[in-house]
Design a protein with these regions (language model features):
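Acidic/His-rich, divalent-metal-binding segments that scaffold phosphate/diphosphate chemistry
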Residues: 1-67
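Conserved active-site and cofactor/substrate-binding residues in soluble primary-metabolism enzymes
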Residues: 7, 11, 27-31, 70, ...
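Predominant activation on well-ordered alpha-helical scaffold segments within soluble catalytic domains
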Residues: 13, 17, 30-33, 37, ...
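C-terminal binding/interaction regions
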Residues: 20, 133, 139-193
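Divalent metal-dependent catalytic cores for phosphoryl transfer on phosphate-bearing substrates
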Residues: 46-148, 160
């Protein structure tokens, strides 16, 4: 068994790729990781790596186990078997409302706040002329949230409630995550096509 503290990003990325083959899901994991690392630097800088890896692995089981009966329960068991600690696994469990795991820590609240928003920001970037996260602005994102036909699978209430649970204004949360994703634009495929 590999102790979680010895699992670096490379090992966690390998775990993601072991269970996730869908390129969009991999990019989503990287997007959430970038947002989580940014929030860790702001709220809990001593644990940036943990926050980042929670973001990276929050949906690693979803590609193979997509039902509410399976995800994130199967992933939590895999992480337990790999030696990840309870607080790491609990954060991942808490991002899915239907698990009933109440979000208590800043890391758990940040994961919930970043998950749906990262997907929505990706969708906003992909409809821009250059398909670039650098073209996305908070005001246009908030306006797009009102268009229920756009990125319809993204839960807007989760985005709003996530920001509120973190104690930040929605516009500030959106801007913060845009900046975080800009820092990872190359790996997200959102650097632009110019």
């Amino acid at each position: 068994m590999v102790h979680w503290q010895l699992m670096d990003r490379e090992g966690s990325l390998a775990l993601l790729h072991e269970y996730t083959k869908n390129e969009s899901l991999i990019k989503h994991a990287l997007a959430v990781e970038s947002c989580m690392r940014a929030y860790a630097r702001k709220l809990d800088s001593a644990h940036e790596e943990t926050w980042g890896l929670v973001g990276l692995l929050h949906d690693f089981d979803y590609d193979q186990f997509p039902t509410q009966d399976e995800h994130p329960y199967v992933g939590e068991k895999i992480l337990e078997d790999r030696g990840y600690p309870p607080e790491f696994r609990r954060a991942i469990m808490s991002h899915a409302e239907y698990t009933g795991v109440v979000r208590e820590t800043p890391m758990e609240k940040a994961l919930f706040a970043c998950d749906e928003l990262a997907g929505f920001l990706t969708a906003c970037a992909l409809v821009k002329p250059n398909k670039s996260i650098f073209e996305v602005e908070a005001a246009s994102v908030i306006k797009k949230m009102k268009d229920k036909a756009f990125a319809r699978s993204v839960n807007r209430d989760d985005i709003r409630n996530g920001a509120a649970a973190l104690g930040v204004e929605l516009a500030d949360h959106v801007s913060f995550c845009i900046q975080a994703m800009q820092g990872a634009a190359g790996s997200l495929g959102l650097k632009g096509v110019t």
